[in-house]
């Protein structure tokens, strides 16, 4: 009694069909993500414009009680302007920049600071960590005139150094700029 049982070969999945379905699904999800990022960008912009005069979650609510509504619509429009740096929610997403750039929402100068292929600026960049330690634009403009004589020397001294700079060096640099503004000459203990 020989039983011949037909051995059925195991089902081989159609990997090409499965791959094409996954690629389509990925494209659909990418489109959905782009639309969500655009909506967040638009809602955030309208929120920042509407709440600029009185306060918002980004700048705080200090002006809510002190600011009274002006009847002058021209002043109202001028006060509704806000900085791109205040777009906290849009900038918190890695994919937001690509989605909003497709709309033309973020100016080109905002994209220049980004590393190619990264999508966002690194959270560990010195610019983000020491933003409060950096002098304001007015301070640097005033100090630039006094520092023009020192710039060639500074460039020569730092050109042989490594590309990595420490927090302490930046702190001393800011102190040096402040001394230049106040005293118009650097203190001996800060120059290196």
Curated annotation (Swiss-Prot):
GO biological process: chromatin remodeling
UniProt entry keywords in alphabetical sequence: Activator, Centromere, Chromatin regulator, Chromosome, Coiled coil, Kinetochore, Nucleus, Transcription, Transcription regulation
Gene Ontology CC: kinetochore; MOZ/MORF histone acetyltransferase complex; NuA4 histone acetyltransferase complex; nucleolus
Primary location group: nucleus
Segments of skewed composition (Basic residues): 164-176
The organism's place on the tree of life at top rank: Eukaryota
Segments forming a coiled coil: 11-45
Membrane spanning residue stretches: none
Biased composition (Acidic residues): 135-144
Biased composition annotated in UniProt, kind: Polar residues: 119-134
Subcellular location: Nucleus, Nucleolus; Chromosome, Centromere, Kinetochore
Signal peptide: none
Compositionally biased spans, kind Basic and acidic residues: 177-192
Positions of region (Disordered): 106-192
InterPro entries: Eaf6 (IPR015418)
Pfam families named among the record's database cross-references: NuA4 (PF09340)
PANTHER family: CHROMATIN MODIFICATION-RELATED PROTEIN MEAF6
Family indicated by similarity: Belongs to the EAF6 family.
Function: Component of the NuA4 histone acetyltransferase complex which is involved in transcriptional activation of select genes principally by acetylation of nucleosomal histone H4 and H2A. This modification may both alter nucleosome - DNA interactions and promote interaction of the modified histones with other proteins which positively regulate transcription. Component of HBO1 complexes, which specifically mediate acetylation of histone H3 at 'Lys-14' (H3K14ac), and have reduced activity toward histone H4. Component of the MOZ/MORF complex which has a histone H3 acetyltransferase activity.
Protein name, as recorded: Chromatin modification-related protein MEAF6
Biological source species: Danio rerio (Zebrafish)
């Amino acid at each position: 009694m020989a039983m011949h049982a037909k051995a059925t070969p195991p089902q081989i999945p159609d990997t090409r069909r499965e791959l094409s379905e996954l690629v389509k699904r990925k494209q659909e999800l990418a489109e959905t993500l782009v639309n969500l990022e655009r909506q967040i960008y638009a809602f955030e912009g309208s929120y920042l414009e509407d709440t600029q005069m009185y306060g918002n979650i980004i700048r705080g609510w200090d002006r809510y009680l002190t600011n009274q509504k002006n009847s002058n619509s021209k002043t109202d429009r001028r006060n509704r302007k806000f900085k791109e740096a205040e777009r906290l929610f849009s900038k918190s997403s890695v994919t937001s920049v690509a989605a909003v750039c497709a709309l033309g929402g973020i100016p080109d100068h905002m994209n220049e600071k980004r590393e190619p292929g990264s999508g966002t600026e690194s959270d560990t960049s010195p610019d983000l960590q020491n933003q409060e330690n950096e002098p304001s634009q007015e301070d640097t403009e005033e100090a630039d005139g006094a520092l023009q004589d020192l710039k060639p020397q500074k460039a020569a001294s730092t050109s042989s150094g490594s590309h990595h700079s420490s927090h302490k060096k930046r702190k001393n640099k800011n102190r040096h700029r402040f001394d230049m503004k106040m005293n118009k000459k650097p203190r001996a203990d800060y120059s290196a």
